[in-house]
A protein has these predicted regions:
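Membrane-embedded and interfacial regions of multi-pass energy-transducing membrane proteins
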Residues: 2-456
Length: 456
């Protein structure tokens, strides 16, 4: 006797409802492969963590103003950790988020390459960034004195670098493989080209840095050894030429913003791509990790040579604006000033090269303070470039106009903060008045004000 199994209509309906159940808001947020959503998350958290990093840097300035009044023995550790956080928790993910959100739209691609990998990149970066921030608070981060917190900072920093590298792979693959049929690389917009070049340089730069964090973990290093590992193995990321790598997308943002503002394309786009490529070559700094690489002919060539593409881009921007009828907007002002801040970083490299010339007594400038000045200039340029991109592509990113009152209010704060922070550190390194209490307090006040304005 055969039995025929049947399901009631109610069971069938409930099964269908379960199959068609829409994912919750949390599930959509975590599992989204939409490139604009991922990009917005990178941009938003990048701005927020950059602000926190600058606030921490400003606190070290306030501590100097009060003659080491409340941070005790931690100013050096907090200043170094703030600069590392500003780069890898702030400006790099910020510009990466701009690329993830905008580049597919520029190329006419419906999505970014490896969307799940891009999502994984963001959540890994966010979780690791939170752990790194906690380690800083516990006297870890970089140059920290607590053993457990220092190890936690080293591991979390390595995870941050891995996550950013994964995101860079997604962007580079999108530019290489998701272009429409017939579009050559020579025809891609400025941001797409700069993002491709930036991704390539990030992979080789961050890959070398990841190796040093792995050595710190495998070697079971204590706080003192990890501090030495950072100074000798990762400190090169905070000085030229390597620090310029993190601002490569700023050049592409400036190109696209100027094209829109002037209403005309640049006459020679191939020359602009050459300028971005030359900048990237001269920003490659993994070869200059050891202190012995400084004060060499090659290092001096890189320090002075980076000026050429920056001046070339400024000249191209000026010529384009002169021939067109530019519409002045907050994005245009921020993008131009961002390139000028890169010029400030290049001038800081000149000072360092001249100071190290011969026996290193020409200026007697502080190498550590000069490196901080370069980091400040580059970080300021990246923040201004990221803000310019956020305003310029505001309809695509946020669904509203970028020429708002809030956007206009951010311009003076960012311009003054970026210029003041870098210039203060540059002047402080040259005049060498650290031994005088009053001068030390004045410089501390200016650093606090500059970092505070950028944080706002």
């Amino acid at each position: 006797m055969a039995l025929t199994e049947t399901r009631s209509d109610t069971d069938a309906t409930s099964a269908g409802d379960r199959a068609r159940r829409a994912p919750s808001a949390v599930e959509q947020l975590i599992g989204s492969g939409d490139h604009t959503s991922i990009g917005r998350l990178f941009i938003g958290f990048g701005f927020a963590l950059a602000s926190l990093s600058l606030t921490l840097w400003a606190l070290t300035g306030v501590d100097a103003l009060t003659d080491n009044g409340f941070l005790g023995s931690r100013p050096a550790q907090l200043a170094a950790s703030a600069q590392v956080a500003l780069l890898f928790l702030g400006i790099v993910p910020l510009l990466l988020g701009v690329a993830i959100a905008v580049v597919p739209l520029q190329l006419g691609s419906p999505s970014i390459a490896f969307p799940r990998a891009a999502t994984l990149s963001f959540w890994t970066w966010l979780l690791s960034s939170g752990i790194f921030a906690v380690s800083i608070a516990l006297d870890g981060g970089v140059l920290g004195g607590d053993e457990t917190a220092a190890k936690l900072g080293n591991v979390s920093l390595g995870a941050v670098l891995v996550a950013l590298s994964l995101g860079a792979v997604c962007v580079a693959t999108t530019v290489m493989a998701h272009r429409p049929l017939g579009m050559r690389l020579a025809w891609v917009p400025g941001l797409s080209w700069a993002s491709l070049v930036s991704a390539a340089l990030l992979l080789v730069t961050l890959g070398s840095a990841i190796a040093h964090t792995v050595l710190g973990q495998v070697g079971r290093m204590g706080p003192a050894a990890l501090a030495t590992n950072f100074t000798d193995g990762l400190g090169w990321l905070l000085r030229g030429p390597a620090v310029f790598v993190f601002a490569i997308p700023v050049l592409g943002i400036a190109i696209d913003v100027v094209v829109t503002a002037s209403g005309r394309r640049f006459a020679h786009t191939d020359v602009l791509q050459l300028i971005v490529g030359l900048y990237a070559i001269l920003a490659f700094g993994a070869w200059a990790q050891l202190p012995s690489a400084l004060n060499t002919a090659l290092w001096t060539l890189f320090a002075f040579g980076i000026t050429v593409p920056i001046l070339g881009l400024l000249g191209a921007i000026g010529d384009s604006l002169r021939q067109g009828k530019p519409v002045v907007s907050p994005a245009l002002i921020l993008s131009i000033v961002s390139v000028l801040l890169l010029m400030g970083a290049a001038v800081t490299g000149w000072v360092q090269s001249l100071s190290l010339a011969g026996q290193g007594t020409l200026f007697g400038a502080s190498p550590a303070t000069l490196a901080s000045a370069q980091t400040a200039f580059v970080a300021g340029a990246a923040l201004l470039g990221g803000a310019a991109a956020s305003l310029h592509w505001s309809p695509l990113l946020w669904g509203g106009p970028g020429n708002s009152v809030e956007g206009r209010l951010t311009v003076p704060l960012l311009v003054l903060g970026g210029g003041l922070l870098g210039t203060t550190l540059l002047v402080q390194s040259v005049v060498q008045l650290d031994g005088e209490t009053t001068a030390f307090q004045i410089f501390g006040l200016l650093v606090a004000v500059g970092a505070g304005l950028l944080a706002l």
